[in-house]
Amino acid sequence: MTTLPVQQLYIHGQRVDATSGKTFRTVNPATGDVIAEVQVASQADVERAVQSAAEGQKVWAAMTAMERSRILRRAVEILRERNDELAHLETLDTGKALAETTTVDIVTGADVVEYYAGLATAIEGIQLPLRESSFFYTRREPLGVVAGIGAWNYPIQIAMWKSAPALAAGNAMVFKPSEVTPLTAIRLAEIYTEAGVPAGVFNVVQGPGREIGQWLTEHPVIEKISFTGGVATGKKVMASAASSSLKEVTMELGGKSPLVICDDADLDRAADIAVMANFFSSGQVCTNGTRVFVPRSMLAAFEAAVVERVKRIRIGDPMAAETNFGPLTSFPHMENVLRYIESGKAEGARLLTGGGRATEGALANGAYVLPTVFSDCRDDMTIVKEEIFGPVMSILAYDDEDEVVRRANDTTFGLAAGVVSKDVSRAHRIIHRLEAGICWINTWGESPAEMPVGGYKESGVGRENGLSTLGHYTRIKSVQVELGDYASVF
């Protein structure tokens, strides 16, 4: 059992006590043990964090872009040096397998910081002549203070995804991690400070989203909100941001993504991709391809191939090197996923494997749900329509391309989509018809720093990562210059 000291807030370059006098517990989902008590920020603490950010941002923005770039690159070096230490803490807090957090979470998050550190010096405006005596130019200026609100499935990675472009562009960020997985955001803040980021440029406030999130979205000093989470909460955040001071928003929300297997696909490759698209990170990935469309002629063979692979999944202690499937991140979430599984059974889906909680030995103490595969699924089933955010695959048979495209697009979500086919032209044709912002052909799930990430429809607004994101952390100032005489009409 690991017990950490009481976790504080991080404001103006140091850990500080919250003034609310309240705390909440963060729990190890593999064991049910309490890891730490975490202090809850009061509204006065949030105000202190915002004012600190406003002060720090002026110092940060006054630095040259090259100075900011060097500091962010130093943060990357520290992140990579402490990869294993941070991964251990992330596994403790989230339940994700250590084999995953050591190779993905910190590594890919640091990649994003490194990517934007390189772009910090490339933020530029334009200059155009209007006539011989006049021209105009544009400047891209930082927004000022922005807020990031993180989700519980990739805590430190999301904190880096949100802070990296914001800081590279000269902004300061007040970040609120999920209260389910609150531990690593403060470690990131300390690393930024150690690297040379001025006090106040990255502050961390803890507590329930319904309070802290509202205070951030309504604060008049904050110019932008970057939110990752569910659709219903995202709509509230967006409405609050608009009604308070017309803040800009980036929303990375939910998904119910289709994975289309074509009849010419290699069966083994298709099954491998489907299993990765559903069970990586115990199924807790917003882009997961949980609606797997399979040609009716391939259905039996595909089902057998998927079940064979699911049986090879190694469920266990997430700290064990051999484990590649840990518990869900919280016990309440486990109960929610189990309710969805029961609804699948009740609505007539055919259970191929899994279908309940893992209760063997020590697993009974944790929030473990067995990798679950349903077939004979219909588009009107609850498990097919709603985001489960857990290890539940729904297999749906189809007969032709037009049908599968229509059914794949028949959703309010539009986050991700994938196609598996040996015919590249066919794969591109189908992908271009699918209504989704992140798409993969003959693979699934990779999100490199260079690739914009975001959804269509109710899956989001704006993008994270990629070159275009950097521009959304700046605003354009246009300046006209007249070198000649000025003639008034009056």
From Swiss-Prot:
The gene is betB. The keyword Glycoprotein does not apply. Belongs to the aldehyde dehydrogenase family. Its EC number is 1.2.1.8. One of its GO terms (molecular function) is betaine-aldehyde dehydrogenase (NAD+) activity. Its cofactor is K(+). The active site is at K162 (charge relay system), E252 (proton acceptor), C286 (nucleophile), E464 (charge relay system). This is Betaine aldehyde dehydrogenase. It catalyses: betaine aldehyde + NAD(+) + H2O = glycine betaine + NADH + 2 H(+). K(+) 2 binds at L246, K457, G460.
